[in-house]
Design a protein with these regions (language model features):
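Long, charge-dense
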Residues: 105-139
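Short glycine-rich or small-residue beta-strand-to-loop segments that form or flank ligand, phosphate
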Residues: 55-57, 86-97, 129-133
Length: 260
């Protein structure tokens, strides 16, 4: 099987039951198919925790105004986050590589509120957003940078946004995934591994699959033909869902105006 970051691709088999300790449930929310995977034991291909995937129309045709997708995405993400406290949004990836630029492009549209007011505004959650870059450009690993930021800011949670890989071509640019297990790339030993055990705070991950292996074991990858639009529109869509999840007292339209 090709490498995949999507939990439901590993455990959703139409003709067999999931492994012991794994529960898979699928539901419809309007025009969005939501699949929840809950892993209750260690020793499987993914860490124990909750994973939510949302199958949506082509991301390249959506944006921050598509409430039919943003509202269910925000609700699923909100359920994985602590109900209160500051949140640090980390845009993981290389902004100079299109397929890897989802994280940095997303944080550009996050509604940042931390440090904006001397006195906290009632109903507005403190949020900071950073795109730390890649170690080749900074000389520091993602773990070092994330750890330093967490120690300084002391957030209630770290929310990491990253490009994902899928094993199914039809899901590229058509799926959102959220999880409360941290950033756990499919490739073993990958440097982008962030979790609560390493950082001391809950780590929630969000992403969209933007590439897949050309074949199992190959170093070649396949990306959607409309990759530029997937990244641009996907970043806007994810940012809108994140903003709505973190600031439920504000409407999608209000958040769009505040981040425009």
């Amino acid at each position: 099987m090709r490498e995949t970051d999507l939990a439901d691709e590993l455990f959703r088999a139409p003709d067999s039951a999931p492994p012991t300790g794994v529960r898979v449930a699928t539901a419809r929310r309007g025009g969005v198919t939501v699949t929840r995977v809950e892993i209750a034991r260690e020793g499987l291909e993914r860490p124990r925790g909750r994973y939510v995937t949302l199958e949506v129309p082509r991301v390249s045709l959506l944006d921050e105004r598509d409430e039919a997708v943003i509202e269910p995405a925000a609700a699923e993400l909100q359920a994985l986050l602590p109900p209160a406290g500051p949140v640090l949004v980390l845009g993981v990836g290389n902004r100079r590589v299109t397929s890897d630029a989802l994280g940095p492009r997303t944080v550009q549209k996050i509604f940042v509120t931390m440090g904006q007011h001397a006195v906290p505004v009632q109903g507005i959650r403190p949020v900071a957003a950073v795109a730390p870059g890649v170690s080749a450009a900074t000389g520091l690993s993602l773990q070092q940078l994330a750890g330093a930021l967490v120690r300084e800011i002391r957030p209630a949670a770290l929310l990491c946004v990253d490009s994902l890989c899928s094993s199914e071509p039809e899901r590229l640019g058509r799926t959102l995934q959220f999880s409360d297990t941290g950033l756990f790339p499919a490739q073993p030993g990958h440097s982008r591994h962030l979790d609560a055990a390493r950082l001391g705070v809950p780590v929630v991950a969000a992403g969209i699959p933007t590439l897949m292996q050309a074949e199992e074991g190959s170093d070649l990858v396949v990306t959607p033909r409309e990759l530029d639009s997937v990244i641009a529109h996907g970043a806007a869509l994810l940012a809108a869902a994140i903003n709505r999840a973190l600031q439920p007292s504000l409407s999608i339209a209000q958040l769009g105006w505040l981040t425009s």
